Amino acid sequence: MNTLVLLLISIAVLFCGYVFYGSWIARQWGVNEGNRPTPAHTMEDGVDYVPAKAPILMGHHFSSIAGAGPITGPIGAAMFGWLPVTLWVLIGGIFFGGVHDFGALFASIRHQGKSIGEIISLNMSKKAKQLFIIFSYLTLILVVAAFAAIVASTFGATYKDGVLDMAASATKASVAMVSIMFILIAIIFGFAVYRRHTPMVISSILGVGAIVLCMAIGMNFHPFYFSMNTWMVLVGIYITIASVTPVWILLQPRDYLSSFLLYAMLIVAIIGIVGAHPTIDEKVFPAFAGFTINNANGTQFLFPILFTTVACGAISGFHSLVSSGTTSKQLDKESDAKPIAYGGMLLECVLAIITLCAIGYARVTGHTHGATDIFAGGIAAMVAAIPGFEGLKNIMYTLLVLTYSAFCLTSLDTATRLARFMFQEFWLEPGENPKDVKDGFRKLMVNPYFATIITVILGISLGMGGFAKIWGLFGAANQLLAAIGLLAVAAWLGNAGKNNKMFLFPMSFMLLVTICSLSLIVKNQIGIIMAGAAGWGPYAQVIIGSLLVILALILAVEGYRTIAHPRKETEINH
């Protein structure tokens, strides 16, 4: 298969899905009926609830949901071949992930910008909400740990026998320097747009120009050669500040500017694919490698492993937390929900397909050292294969690594803010706001600074202490979040008298996938324990995996009961 043909077919399919299926869903739910004001306006507080222009919010939303997922997911699932991954990305994105993200955002804005947990409480039960929040919070802690470690490893200098390896560390130091300057530019951009009311076009042009200048400076001046552990601490301090800072100061402008890095990355990738249009070599990257694959991690089954590994490239539970956690509090108009949520998911599918194209060429050119090298190396090598572009490989590689790091950093502080919301929400009664709490203990628990500090300490400690030992659970846990998100929105739509049939198969399928995946993980880890070669990781995975299966079953029973017997109550938001 030629990579250009694969990309064009995929874009055409996704475009049709957006125009036809996405529009049908919007009509079924009554999106934008009556021109309702969104929570960003009715509950504006200048910190979390702040209306944002659609391009800025699209930048935040996409940068937050993308992270490393649409790159690492397809790379991990590529062991089964490019065809099954492509089919799942296209089908999953249109009928699963897009519906999930759009539904979560729409449900949240009809519930005053509340999270999926609060929607579960109002439409299912308080017990279901508490279970969901505990599960979501623990999953977010794992996300914070993993992304903090990824960012720190991207920045951290390489030491050999205690001596700094300058040559091996130069690119990392460049990425770190550019990232630091990028944060400062974002703050200036935020003040220019929201306080000085500088026109968006002028601000964007100056912002993009500043990013280019930052890259030029960072590639030639990079004085910070800190170790990975030092960067972990510094990243922890950064996300502590970022998650309690008003969104207009840092989160909105930085994510908006990050979106230009994404567009640059997509343009570079498309130039590489169009210009070089290499054919995928079936010998190194077959269309279909089989239903079972044996590798260093044992026997891998296409079902359910494919559907939990691709993750963000087709559907991801983390997206529902972003949609209902930060995006819904910044949505300016209901009509923006479809392009931002449904369109954002399909754009992520395009990135997943580009990743598949990169894998095929990376395996030919020898870029096989981890997800970052596979993606950046594959795309950069394609660009360098175009006549006249041979000298751009190193520049393109650095740009792509920087973009990858920027996405991880964006997802990291969004995840920290979401975890703070979850921690606070656990202690609140339905409909109660943190400012209303007078009780001493609960007042401490819902304090945003206390909630953030606890979250960061747990996340950074796990990141420094071996999150990889339980990372195997993340794929299944993330997809379980997606199944529960689908379940919650379907329950609300049923209670509100709206069509929820488009949720029934996706949520049932994802529940089946996650329960099977978790059961396989538990079985494999028990085998490791019985073999007598286990540290604490396998024990933790068995315990957590078993609890997640029980949680999935409890929430499934509650959800299906609600869907089967919807309650038309006056407090349900229509």
Positions of the model-derived regions?
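A generic transmembrane alpha-helix motif of multi-pass inner-membrane proteins
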Residues: M1-G17, G207-S258, I271-G275, Q300, ...
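Extracellular loop-to-transmembrane helix junctions
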Residues: N2-V19, A77-S108, G117, A176-F182, ...
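Membrane-interface "cap" regions at the ends of multi-pass membrane proteins
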Residues: C16-I71, S259, F301, I305
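Flexible loop linkers connecting adjacent transmembrane helices
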Residues: S23-V50, G73-G76, T86, L90, ...
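Membrane-interface helix-loop-helix modules in multi-pass membrane proteins
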Residues: A52-H111, L122-K126, V143, A148-Y159, ...
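Membrane-helix boundary/coupling elements in multi-pass transport proteins
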Residues: A68-I75, G92-H100, A104, S108-Q112, ...
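Loop-to-transmembrane helix boundary motifs in multi-pass membrane proteins
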Residues: N123-I141, G343-V350, L392-M396, E425-M464
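Extracellular/periplasmic helix-exit of transmembrane alpha-helices
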Residues: I273-I293, L346-I379, T414
